[in-house]
Amino acid sequence: MAVTAAMVKELREKTGAGMLDCKKALVETDGDMQAAIDFLREKGIAKAAAKGDRIAAEGLTAVAVEGNKAVLVEINSETDFVAKNEKFQTLVNNVAKAVLASGATTAEAALAAEYEAGKTLETYIQEEASTIGEKISLRRVAVLEKAEDAVFGTYLHMGGRIGSVVVIDGTSDETVAKDVAMHVAAASPLYATRDEVSAEEIDREKKVLTEQALNEGKPANIVEKMIAGRMNKYFEEICLVDQTFVKDSDFKVGKYVESKGGKINSFVRFEVGEGMEKREENFAEEVMNQLKK
């Protein structure tokens, strides 16, 4: 498979490795992006790719809650200027409420739902976009539900650049729930518990860590013990219950919630633009600057 400049760019953004290292990794792995990431990590050149990679899009997230259901939405605009516009902020909140009322669980279903008599949510967004003067789109929707004896925690960071919702069972303590939602926004966990991590992902991580240890010259007979310790650290980075609580470093998040009589059920976190392509305009200039060195 031919390795393109766009592929090198994507790998560099995901790993922070140099362009030549990225190109070599892609050549060695026949253009397989995940395999190339693992290749760079095994060589000690790159860290694990963060969830969402680089962020390019503008917009806001918003939360709507009613009873035992909560909705988190992400709406994109073309510029940060519009994202700070009061009309856009009103639109985002209206969309979140409309999605909650519609019962939709996907962006596609939400857009097709009725917003008001004779008008779909998609039409409402298009009309407001014409007034605001930019393309505006509902990118994604997440719906969480809770039991009667559970509580929602919600948090919007930087006016909505990051939005999070958590469900905590066994308590009605909204302060605890909000604190955990703030932690989710700050620490960006990928999973609630270790049970949610797939066997495939665990096996891949063990392989990478094993190769790292062997490349460091560690004796094979102690590599297995090292891997066990490093896997625990890996879970502490990606699993909410195992992360060190940002508001009290004496606690892991799961233990903190348990100390308050609750148990973490689930969460969702949106960061505006995560996973979307970075704009292309500066890549050629960046390459030229590297070649001049």
Swiss-Prot record:
Residues 79-82 are annotated as: Involved in Mg(2+) ion dislocation from EF-Tu. Keywords: Cytoplasm, Elongation factor, Protein biosynthesis. It is found in: Cytoplasm. Its main location: cytoplasm. InterPro entries: EF-Ts_dimer_sf, Transl_elong_EFTs/EF1B, Transl_elong_EFTs/EF1B_dimer, Transl_elong_Ts_CS, UBA-like_sf. GO terms for molecular function: translation elongation factor activity. One of its GO terms (cellular component) is cytoplasm. PANTHER family: ELONGATION FACTOR TS (PTHR11741), ELONGATION FACTOR TS, MITOCHONDRIAL (PTHR11741:SF0). Belongs to the EF-Ts family. Associates with the EF-Tu.GDP complex and induces the exchange of GDP to GTP. It remains bound to the aminoacyl-tRNA.EF-Tu.GTP complex up to the GTP hydrolysis stage on the ribosome. NCBIfam families: tsf. This is Elongation factor Ts.
